[in-house]
């Protein structure tokens, strides 16, 4: 059975190393900045476990009207075994909120597979222009916004944009 286990101080570095392995530098925070996020009440950094065995990690933020998944990564050696799908199903039932996430435009085969994975879970690709703020004072990253269970209307997108800028990405400026 899939569980989301909050990462403790003792396990933080080892789980964070898996985040480094799964995401390019420009799509994640430095370790010190990631630790600052724990000061925000909306922040969740969890290990995904199955029968107490670690199968991946997820970083998400819970807001009043939506849940934002910032990162999810299943351990390389056990991908395509349904852990990602089951993790999203758990989020859907545990939080009963619309879920929003960012993904790269589908240009490579891997990116196309990733978008298809999310679409198979019921996520919709929104058409809003969106650029993820830089984690390292470099160039921002153009990404697509996906949402579950439906497309975001303009008001919902504006709320997502504003709240993630104020809370999620403000952490980058060390203002926790």
Predicted regions and their residues:
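Conserved beta-strand in the GNAT
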Residues: 47, 53-61, 66-73
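Short beta-strand micro-motifs in enzyme catalytic cores
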Residues: 44-46, 67-70, 140-146
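Conserved acetyl-CoA-binding loop-helix of GNAT-fold acetyltransferases
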Residues: 74, 80-94
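Conserved GNAT acetyl-CoA-binding A-motif
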Residues: 95-109
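Short amphipathic alpha-helix that is part of the acyltransferase structural core
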Residues: 1-29, 143-145, 155-176
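A contiguous, mid-protein "functional segment" used to position or interact
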Residues: 124-157
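Conserved active-site alpha-helix within GNAT-family acetyltransferase domains
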Residues: 105-128
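Active-site rim helix/loop that mediates acceptor-substrate recognition in acyltransferases
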Residues: 23-51
């Amino acid at each position: 059975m899939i569980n989301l286990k909050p990462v403790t101080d003792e396990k933080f570095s080892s789980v964070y190393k898996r985040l480094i392995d799964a995401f390019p530098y420009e799509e994640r925070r430095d370790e010190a900045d990631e630790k600052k996020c724990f000061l925000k009440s909306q922040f969740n950094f969890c290990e995904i476990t199955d029968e107490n065995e670690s199968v991946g990690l997820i970083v998400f933020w819970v807001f009043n009207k939506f849940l934002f998944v910032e990162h999810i990564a299943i351990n390389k050696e056990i991908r395509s075994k349904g852990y990602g799908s089951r993790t999203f199903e758990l989020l859907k039932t545990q939080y009963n909120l619309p879920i929003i996430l960012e993904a790269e435009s589908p240009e490579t085969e891997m990116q196309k597979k990733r978008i298809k994975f999310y679409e198979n879970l019921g996520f919709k690709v929104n058409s809003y222009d969106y650029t993820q703020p830089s984690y390292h004072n470099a160039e921002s990253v153009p990404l697509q916004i996906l949402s579950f269970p439906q497309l975001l209307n303009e008001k919902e997108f504006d709320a997502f944009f504003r709240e993630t800028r104020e809370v999620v990405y403000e952490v980058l400026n060390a203002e926790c």
